[in-house]
């Protein structure tokens, strides 16, 4: 389904999605290590490319996007379209419902 916008979803389903699709590259807890991807603690309200000690692509640093429900909703559908040049090797979550569930989980998990 094209378009759509963020709607609160099911955080426990989002947690499962995170475990299977995201956790091999990202940690969420405060002080969590940067892995293949940056630690996601404090994700909401921060700018792209801003985690200390993580080597981002220039594209990511220069995107100047602030992460929130709506930017994540669009980004996670097709990361390389939203930030051309990102090194995130993830094809995206095509279903709105999956993105809603994941973002709902991330809002809690990254606080």
Curated annotation (Swiss-Prot):
<keyword id="KW-0488">Methylation</keyword>
<dbReference type="GO" id="GO:0020037">
    <property type="term" value="F:heme binding"/>
</dbReference>
<keyword id="KW-0479">Metal-binding</keyword>
<feature type="modified residue" description="N6,N6-dimethyllysine">
    <location>
        <position position="80"/>
    </location>
</feature>
<dbReference type="InterPro" id="IPR009056">
    <property type="entry name" value="Cyt_c-like_dom"/>
</dbReference>
<protein>
    <recommendedName>
        <fullName>Cytochrome c</fullName>
    </recommendedName>
</protein>
<keyword id="KW-0349">Heme</keyword>
<keyword id="KW-0813">Transport</keyword>
<feature type="binding site" description="axial binding residue">
    <location>
        <position position="88"/>
    </location>
    <ligand>
        <name>heme c</name>
    </ligand>
</feature>
<dbReference type="GO" id="GO:0046872">
    <property type="term" value="F:metal ion binding"/>
</dbReference>
<keyword id="KW-0408">Iron</keyword>
<keyword id="KW-0679">Respiratory chain</keyword>
<feature type="binding site" description="covalent">
    <location>
        <position position="25"/>
    </location>
    <ligand>
        <name>heme c</name>
    </ligand>
</feature>
<dbReference type="GO" id="GO:0005758">
    <property type="term" value="C:mitochondrial intermembrane space"/>
</dbReference>
<dbReference type="InterPro" id="IPR036909">
    <property type="entry name" value="Cyt_c-like_dom_sf"/>
</dbReference>
<comment type="similarity">
    <text>Belongs to the cytochrome c family.</text>
</comment>
<feature type="binding site" description="axial binding residue">
    <location>
        <position position="26"/>
    </location>
    <ligand>
        <name>heme c</name>
    </ligand>
</feature>
<feature type="modified residue" description="N6,N6,N6-trimethyllysine; partial">
    <location>
        <position position="94"/>
    </location>
</feature>
<dbReference type="InterPro" id="IPR002327">
    <property type="entry name" value="Cyt_c_1A/1B"/>
</dbReference>
<keyword id="KW-0496">Mitochondrion</keyword>
<dbReference type="GO" id="GO:0009055">
    <property type="term" value="F:electron transfer activity"/>
</dbReference>
<keyword id="KW-0249">Electron transport</keyword>
<feature type="binding site" description="covalent">
    <location>
        <position position="22"/>
    </location>
    <ligand>
        <name>heme c</name>
    </ligand>
</feature>
<comment type="function">
    <text>Electron carrier protein. The oxidized form of the cytochrome c heme group can accept an electron from the heme group of the cytochrome c1 subunit of cytochrome reductase. Cytochrome c then transfers this electron to the cytochrome oxidase complex, the final protein carrier in the mitochondrial electron-transport chain.</text>
</comment>
<dbReference type="Pfam" id="PF00034">
    <property type="entry name" value="Cytochrom_C"/>
</dbReference>
């Amino acid at each position: 389904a094209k378009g759509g916008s963020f709607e609160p979803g099911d955080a426990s389903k989002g947690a499962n999605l995170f475990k299977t699709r995201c956790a091999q590259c990202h940690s969420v807890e405060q002080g969590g290590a940067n892995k293949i991807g940056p630690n996601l603690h404090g994700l909401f309200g921060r700018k792209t490319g801003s985690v200390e000690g993580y080597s981002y692509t220039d594209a990511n640093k220069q995107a100047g996007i602030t992460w929130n429900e709506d930017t994540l909703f669009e980004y996670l559908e097709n990361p390389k379209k939203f930030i051309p040049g990102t090194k995130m090797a993830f094809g995206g979550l095509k279903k709105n419902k999956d993105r809603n569930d994941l973002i709902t989980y991330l809002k809690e998990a990254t606080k």
